[in-house]
Amino acid sequence: MKYLNQQEAISVDEELFNEYKFSVDQLMELAGLSCAHAIADAYSPDRSNKVLICCGPGNNGGDGLVAARHLSLMSFVPYVYYPKRTDKELFKNLQHQAESMGITVSVDCPAGEWVEAEFGLIVDALFGFSFKPPVRESFRPIMEVLQKTKLPIVSVDIPSGWDVELGPQTDCDIMPDCLISLTAPKLCAKHLVNAKHYLGGRFVPGKLEEKYAMNLPAYKGRDLFVRLS
């Protein structure tokens, strides 16, 4: 299985939109749904049913908003931290859908002590494969919470703060308990240490997989994810 570099990941996304005519909301829904299913596979809601989902301003954050909605239908209780809103209709709709299902969507950075006491699991959907260090000032408080937490962290596609190709660059980078790679793993996933690794996003056309020599593993039956490790 191939691990994509940053430019390959960007190019694959562009081809899905331009060549294969997928829409952003279509891929986001499929990606977020697969994340929710992978999380439900990895963590029992009996132990981790209250989930803090940290969403950034881009498509990675959109995946997190979708995952929150689906997790709420799987016996989890999501709480979304979504500090940097956008005027794009898609993201407004995703927020509205989450709130309409009784999910709290907050702009206030949660205190570390409250997070430890209140939640059993954290989902990191802050930054995706377009991220380039350093982390912006406005996101440093939540990154500090993620760096210091003793709770398991599930990162969506890229552990936030990591270099997309080189992985963690400092001792302070977060170390997820689980990574859900989307479409195909990125090079940074080779730097995971003792972490669960899932692949989600069961929508890659065969010709596109062949063009980039992805050699993706087969999904079983109706599964929306593959566990890689």
From Swiss-Prot:
Transmembrane segments: none annotated. It comes from Anopheles gambiae (African malaria mosquito). PANTHER family: NAD(P)H-HYDRATE EPIMERASE (PTHR13232:SF10). One of its GO terms (molecular function) is metal ion binding. GO terms for cellular component: mitochondrion. Its cofactor is K(+). SUPFAM superfamilies: YjeF N-terminal domain-like. Catalyzes the epimerization of the S- and R-forms of NAD(P)HX, a damaged form of NAD(P)H that is a result of enzymatic or heat-dependent hydration. This is a prerequisite for the S-specific NAD(P)H-hydrate dehydratase to allow the repair of both epimers of NAD(P)HX. Keywords: Isomerase, Metal-binding, NAD, NADP, Nucleotide-binding, Potassium. K(+) binds at N60, D124, S160. It is an enzyme of class 5 (isomerase). It catalyses: (6R)-NADHX = (6S)-NADHX; (6R)-NADPHX = (6S)-NADPHX. NCBIfam families: yjeF_nterm. Binds 1 potassium ion per subunit. InterPro entries: YjeF_N_dom, YjeF_N_dom_sf, YJEFN_prot_NAXE-like. Belongs to the NnrE/AIBP family. The keyword RNA-binding does not apply. This is NAD(P)H-hydrate epimerase.
